[in-house]
Amino acid sequence: MNHSHKCMMLLMISALFATGISAQKYKVKSIAWERLEVTAALDSAPDSDAFRIVEPYKAKVDSTMMPVLGLSRVPMTAGRPESTLSNWAADVLVEGSTATGLETADMGLVNMGGLRNNMPEGIVRRGDVMLISPFENRLVVLEMKGKDVKELMDNIASVGGEGVSSSVRLVITKDRKVAHVTIGGKEIEDGKVYRIATLDYLAEGNDHMTALKKAIKRHSLGMLIRDVMSESIIKNRVIDSKMEGRIIVQQP
């Protein structure tokens, strides 16, 4: 068989395979998943050589992740429109806003997407906080005019809610519009300047929080969010959180 015949045969075979494959249609019948923590308990017969290599690094990781910071009275989770974990986190940012001598922020804001794990009930270790806030986000305090804070509330309503501090009461409609909002029990004044404690990531207008880019002044406190959280737990020793109606979706 000459070269041209071989090429022709290969092309015909390839075409047959392609036709056969494209003719088959696959449909997903079901999807199931479970969370499986990969720990040493899964390894019934650990490799001694691998263990010797890993052990020094494991010791370093354990020294970072295992220290106890305090206790949590309840398990905390994140979710819209309001949740125990986002409530606690937003309040912690307000608490941390005074670290460099600034006045206490009028409002704290965290994004649900930035809270990557749950807070356990009982003992809270440094590793738990690192899992909740694994990113290199830092605390900033923004000064904003009231009219722009109103726009920020529109941003929050448009995504169905984010984590806001205890000073905020926001009612949103089913179609994600602001029905009513107050800060510190008062309606927002267009000309007043408000201080917002939040993440530098959100301050750039990310996660639909575009109004934050209109801040008239920005104070970068330099502290990682997870460090702010850790210091708050150490300071308070026992933490707690509950649903307070900070963000409510109107029912028809």
At which residue positions do the language-model features occur?
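Bacterial N-terminal signal peptides
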Residues: 9-18
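Bacterial N-terminal signal peptides that target proteins for export
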Residues: 1-9
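Feature captures C-terminal
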Residues: 25-41, 83, 87-252
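Sec/Tat signal peptide C-region and signal peptidase I cleavage site
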Residues: 19-23
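Post-signal-peptide N-terminal segment of Sec-exported extracytoplasmic proteins
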Residues: 49-59
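Acidic/histidine-rich, surface-exposed loop or edge segments in extracytoplasmic proteins
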Residues: 63-80, 208-215
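Membrane metalloprotein/metal-transporter helix-bundle signature
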Residues: 35-46, 52, 70-73
